[in-house]
Amino acid sequence: MPLASDVKQKIMSDYATVERDTGSPEVQVAMLTRRISDLTEHLKVHKHDHHSRRGLLLLVGRRRRLLNYLSKTDINRYRALIERLGLRR
């Protein structure tokens, strides 16, 4: 389930390091986190939707890889991001 363009723009403006930033790990992780939360809410209602559950697991893995990359390259940005998003590690 893709995000609406206005939601994407809001996330980009909130987490971008420079203007028109779409590829930084912070923006990517924030967008994945939003998609994960949307899918989690969907799965609370539709418990037997296993195709969406697999998609959720893929998104979580992608976010985990981006967070690992960020923690290895710049630990301060990583800590700030997980605190801002409310993720636990």
Swiss-Prot record:
UniProt keywords, alphabetically: Ribonucleoprotein, Ribosomal protein, RNA-binding, rRNA-binding
Domain of life: Bacteria
CDD domains on file: Ribosomal_S15p_S13e (cd00353)
Pfam families: Ribosomal_S15
Keyword Membrane listed: no
Gene Ontology CC, one term: cytosolic small ribosomal subunit
GO MF annotations, alphabetized: rRNA binding; structural constituent of ribosome
InterPro entries in the record: Ribosomal_uS15, Ribosomal_uS15_bac-type, uS15_NS1_RNA-bd_sf
GO biological process terms held by the UniProt record: translation
Record family assignment: Belongs to the universal ribosomal protein uS15 family.
Role according to the record: One of the primary rRNA binding proteins, it binds directly to 16S rRNA where it helps nucleate assembly of the platform of the 30S subunit by binding and bridging several RNA helices of the 16S rRNA. Forms an intersubunit bridge (bridge B4) with the 23S rRNA of the 50S subunit in the ribosome.
Complexes and interactors: Part of the 30S ribosomal subunit. Forms a bridge to the 50S subunit in the 70S ribosome, contacting the 23S rRNA.
Protein name according to UniProt: Small ribosomal subunit protein uS15
